Amino acid sequence: MRTSSGRPEGGQGTQDPAPTNGHDGPSDDGTGAAPPPTAARRPRVTWRKLTFLPAALIAVLLATWLWFEQADLDALTRNALSDGQVSKALWQHIELTAISTFFVLIIAIPLGILLTRPRFRRAAPAAMALANMGQATPAIGLLALLVIWLGIGRRAALIGIIAYAVLPVLSNTIAGLKANDPTLLEAARGIGMSPLGVLTRVELPLAVPLILAGVRTALVLNVGTATLATFGGGGGLGVLITTGITSQRMPVLVVGSILTVALALLVDWLASLAELLLRPRGLEAGP
């Protein structure tokens, strides 16, 4: 029986159809047709990560500069820090780090890929042993041997830095490729991918986080090891450090040391940002 308004009396009879629009229907009681809310994701790179370390480095460098402006420096100290000597040493250090890292990447990553292929897996222990020898040898001793062999110059310094930094990238490349899920690789082969396609589209993207971690370690190692290039005639910030030690001029030593530490921290910060930004999406949740 219907009332004069056309509605069923006493709640009996047919009811009005439920609204089909997700904005009109219930969304919180779990019975409506509205889609479940998606979980909010934290940004992969926060403002704190972007600004804290650079701000701290700028503050330290500014404090160092203000101290030098007010310090009473003798003629020898001023000569060691003037006429573009500091900028020249810093630029040489950056060049040594960049060139050595480039060669580390083009040597260690392809070699790591090669040593994970079935035909060359037996050679992996020997290659890792050589890489371990390169890093286990004291850097100053290795540089001295290279200077005896190649002579004084940047080439000996670069080879020593490269030999010292190959291990982390090589070992992380091998570990990253070996850690891939075999079922994913079989699925890729099952849909008709070639071996090269499996490597470039499945294996390497999954191994990117570990490879980038190795590259980050190698970068910091290169910045530190490049200070020893001065003993082989390679230049760099080590020139300021050794000059400050031999001449007993603490300000020169402080400048070389602070710039080396600041450059290492800056390189590590840039590498950490690259590690976050270049990581394939979906491999890890959160930053």
Q: What does each of the following model-derived ranges do?
A:
Residues L111-L146, S171-A179, E186:
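Cytoplasmic-entry segments and transmembrane alpha-helices of multi-pass inner-membrane transporters
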Residues L177-T183, A187-A207, G233-G235:
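Short helix-to-coil transition segments within interhelical loops
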Residues R2-S4, V254-P287:
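C-terminal transmembrane helix and the adjacent membrane-cytosol boundary/short C-terminal tail
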